[in-house]
């Protein structure tokens, strides 16, 4: 949350609505920080884990396979990733942690150019030259060279779209239509002309605000690093969230710092069995906590109206069950879902929360056993599709799961090996839709058949996979309905208004987290948000 929280009273009762990774981790951290507090976690589905879903199924021959239907990797440089990995170590599960080495083929990333050819995102001199000679590289040199000379926003501190700030800073719209649009489609499933620069493109936004330009920010940062280099070499310390985490749980600071530095060496991290391994491990740990109760498959339908002199809060479930006298309610579901739970006397708050729409993402998994049909030159993490491509299939991007899985290495369990390393198979996940599905703000989802046929056409055109191999493969179709809040221009101002209105209505009884209220929708960020708020409530 943006606003501060106050300490819970002794033996307080807490309700958590939403059993995704945000709700699970908030519950885990708070239950450890305050064992006296009784926590009840409510999840509408029969499983916890939310949008992190590593689906264990079988192929057409009856052999077990795992298909990722959500996020699958983590960035090693994130503080939230350190919290995840340290939690796994605490629970004796560090053997599941896997890494992708720098320079590994699985770290290669591609963009789709206007002629439907894959172009590697530069990571060397030769790939930089190829990129600059491609239409995707148009405007890049002149845009970067002239960036220092271009004027700041005429309205400093005012939010604007990512497209607007990029076009102003780089002096053309090629960069935003090509590289930037592809990147943000992959993260947010949305359009650069709509996304908030202040929310989703913070570095560029604040570089201009504080330094005047990105070039000047780079110069100033280099000077600062040069001055502090000797000090850093002598004494490196934990900062921010990791410092608070170390203090809160009495961690060995040097070991936590070593873990953080180790993880930063790797561009990507993952978990054996898929990323859902983490929420499953946390759920299993919570099942053993005496102060935690988990209710699944019985959605909360209402936050009960309370008398003016009442300080506790109650919930009503779909079954008709009522859960009363909670001292604190944590909501980790999306803003529109929160709006549906509010009593009628909170109509103005409901309308405010309903202002935020969400994008729907369609996921299509393709699996072909015993054959690798991705060309050797195109092996990598996958590719994203920029606005500059005509893109009739409304494709956001494609992830090459089989390439990633074959190149994972156990990070801490050096004696074990990757069982997929020598296996020949093809596994990819296509991401479709997002903002491109929306008609008048409402997602219109095409049928399974139409969507899979569009993905087949894309894989044939972009990767050269034959129709025979496409027809021989196994296909899975999943709709992640309204899974990603739309972080449009003005989102931060909206969030502050919403949180203030919540506190006006409920005081310190209600807090919010999850994708709609954390720094970003990424898994590490919602976990950091959950820890920070659990810490405030525990002090």
UniProtKB/Swiss-Prot annotation:
Family the entry assigns: Belongs to the protoporphyrinogen/coproporphyrinogen oxidase family. Protoporphyrinogen oxidase subfamily.
Enzyme class: oxidoreductase
GO molecular function, one term: oxygen-dependent protoporphyrinogen oxidase activity
Cofactor: FAD
pH dependence: Optimum pH is 7.2.
Effect of mutating residue 424 to E: In HEM14-1; loss of activity
Domain of life, source organism: Eukaryota
Subcellular location: Mitochondrion inner membrane
Gene: HEM14
Record key words, sorted: FAD, Flavoprotein, Heme biosynthesis, Membrane, Mitochondrion, Mitochondrion inner membrane, Oxidoreductase, Porphyrin biosynthesis
Family annotation (NCBIfam families): proto_IX_ox
Biological process terms in GO annotation: heme biosynthetic process; protoporphyrinogen IX biosynthetic process
Pathway terms, separated by semicolons: Porphyrin-containing compound metabolism; protoporphyrin-IX biosynthesis; protoporphyrin-IX from protoporphyrinogen-IX: step 1/1
Binding site for FAD: 18-23, 43-44, 51, 70-73, 300, 521-523
Protein name, UniProt field: Protoporphyrinogen oxidase
Annotated cofactor note: Binds 1 FAD per subunit.
One cellular component term from this protein's GO annotations in UniProt: mitochondrial inner membrane
Species of origin: Saccharomyces cerevisiae (strain ATCC 204508 / S288c)
More details: Present with 5350 molecules/cell in log phase SD medium.
């Amino acid at each position: 949350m943006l606003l501060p929280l106050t300490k819970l009273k002794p033996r307080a009762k807490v309700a958590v609505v939403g059993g995704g990774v945000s709700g699970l981790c908030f519950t885990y951290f708070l239950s450890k920080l305050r064992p006296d507090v009784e926590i009840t976690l409510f999840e509408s589905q029969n499983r916890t884990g939310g949008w992190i879903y590593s689906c264990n199924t079988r192929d057409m021959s009856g052999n077990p396979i795992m298909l990722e239907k959500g996020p699958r990797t983590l960035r090693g440089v994130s503080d939230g990733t350190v919290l995840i990995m340290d939690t796994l170590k605490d629970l004796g599960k560090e053997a599941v942690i896997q890494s992708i080495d720098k320079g590994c083929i699985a770290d290669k990333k591609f963009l789709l150019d206007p002629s439907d050819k894959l172009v590697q995102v530069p990571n060397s001199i030769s790939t930089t030259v190829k990129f600059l000679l491609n239409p995707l590289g148009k405007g890049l040199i002149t845009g970067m060279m002239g960036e220092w000379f271009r004027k700041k926003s005429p309205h400093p501190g005012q939010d604007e779209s990512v497209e607007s700030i990029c076009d102003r800073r780089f002096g053309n719209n090629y960069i935003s239509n090509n590289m930037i649009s592809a990147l943000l489609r992959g993260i947010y499933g949305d359009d650069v002309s709509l996304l908030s620069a202040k929310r989703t493109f913070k570095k560029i936004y604040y570089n201009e605000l504080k330094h005047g330009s990105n070039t000047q920010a780079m110069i100033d940062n280099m000077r600062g690093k040069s001055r502090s280099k000797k000090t850093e070499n002598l004494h490196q310390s934990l900062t921010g969230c990791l410092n608070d985490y170390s203090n809160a749980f009495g961690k060995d600071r040097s070991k936590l710092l070593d873990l953080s530095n180790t993880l930063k060496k790797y561009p990507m991290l993952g978990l054996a069995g898929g990323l859902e391994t983490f929420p499953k491990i946390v759920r299993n740990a919570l099942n053993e906590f005496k102060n935690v109760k988990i209710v699944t498959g019985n959605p909360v339908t209402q936050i009960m109206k309370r008398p003016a002199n009442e300080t506790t809060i109650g919930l009503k479930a779909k079954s008709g069950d009522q859960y009363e006298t909670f001292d604190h309610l944590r909501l980790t579901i999306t803003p529109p879902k929160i709006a549906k739970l509010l009593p009628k006397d909170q109509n103005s708050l409901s309308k405010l929360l309903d202002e935020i729409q969400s994008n729907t993402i369609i996921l299509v998994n393709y699996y072909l056993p015993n054959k690798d049909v991705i060309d050797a030159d195109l092996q990598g993490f996958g590719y994203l599709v920029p606005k500059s491509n005509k893109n009739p299939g409304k494709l956001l991007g494609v992830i090459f799961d089989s390439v990633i899985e074959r190149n994972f290495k156990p990070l801490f369990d050096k004696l074990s090996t990757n069982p997929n390393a020598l296996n020949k198979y093809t596994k990819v996940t296509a991401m479709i839709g997002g903002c491109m599905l929306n008609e008048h703000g409402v997602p219109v989802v095409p049928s399974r058949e139409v969507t899979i046929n569009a993905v087949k056409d894309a894989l044939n055109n972009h990767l050269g996979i034959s129709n025979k191999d496409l027809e021989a493969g196994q296909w899975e179709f999943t709709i992640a309905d309204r899974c990603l809040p739309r972080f449009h221009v003005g989102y931060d101002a909206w969030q502050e208004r919403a949180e203030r209105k919540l506190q006006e209505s409920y005081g310190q009884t209600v807090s919010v987290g999850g994708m709609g209220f954390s720094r970003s929708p990424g898994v590490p960020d919602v976990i950091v948000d959950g820890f920070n708020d659990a810490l405030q409530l525990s002090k």
